[in-house]
Every structure is written in C-alpha cells, then in structure tokens.
Curated annotation (Swiss-Prot):
The keyword Cell cycle does not apply. Residues 24-85 form the HTH asnC-type domain. Contains an N-terminal DNA-binding domain, followed by a rather long linker and a C-terminal effector-binding domain, which is also involved in oligomeric interactions. This is HTH-type transcriptional regulator AldR. Residues 1-21 are annotated as: Disordered. Keywords: Activator, DNA-binding, Repressor, Transcription, Transcription regulation.
Amino acid sequence: MSEGSSITGVQTPGSPKDVRARDLDDIDRRILLALHDDARIPNSALAEMVGIAPSTCHGRVRRLQEIGVIRGFYTDIDPAAVGLGLQAMISVSLQSNARGKIRSFIAHIRTRPQVMDVYFLAGGDDFILHVAARDTEDLRKFVVENLNADSDVAGTQTSLIFEHLRGASPL
C-alpha cells in the first residue's frame, strides 16, 4: 500500500492527489494500456508505441506514479510453479463485536505467506482472501489455524479456484 494511505484505502494527508479520470489524456491512457500488457517494456519502445519522445514518455510515467495512478510494478509469480498448486478464495465474516478490530485482522492476515490478496468488502462478508496452498491439507491447516481459531472470525466459506485469468485493464 502506498505511503499516506490507510489500510482501508481512504486517502490521508500526504497521500497522492485525488486524480480524476478527466486528468488523464489519451496519451496517458495509451501508456497505461501498454504498461498493463507489459510492465517491463523499455521506455524507448513505450515512447515509440504511443508516439512521443522518450524523455516525454519517461516524464509521463513518473507523473502517473507520483499522482498514484500507477501504484507499482509487480512480478506475476505462478503459484503452481513454486509448489503452491491449489488456490482458493475464502470469504470471511467477523463477529459483530469485532468491528473495531478490522485493522488488526488485516495487518495479521497479510503476514501469512499463503495470502496473496486481501479484499475488504461491503455486504454479507467482511473479507475475501485469495490464498495459495500446496494441497488440500495445507489449505485446511491455514483455515483452521488462522481463521477458525480466531475468536473474532464468525465464519468462513472456501471456494477452490480452477483457473485464474488476468482481467483487462481498468481503462
């Protein structure tokens, strides 16, 4: 999470400015689409692709980072390739008296090596956890030791992931 933003994603003082879609022009959008497809594209190739000078392209990418549009560049690791062949989405509901412990739950659960993503929700469930495990026993152990054993957790529901496909750019 970027410096200056809270765990819930609410902007706080010192966080990147509030960027509106209208602040992005066609060139910014083309840069973002190209980086979404290949975040490792060399700046010179990116500049050529969008039709601007490399120095201009570099400045625009830096600006998009500074204002918080580009949050980072990540390595997409295949969990199965590193021995974590089973993935699941786990819906988690906290006890109604545990609402004040949401931040501590998030901070704790993010430290678990099986947790790939944490989604804080509105609706019937409080969270969805995207987890990776070696096998069903490893997944069961994660749920029992990290969720069922937590007195603040009211319930969980686990759905196995058969295939994970990356979605389109949000543009």
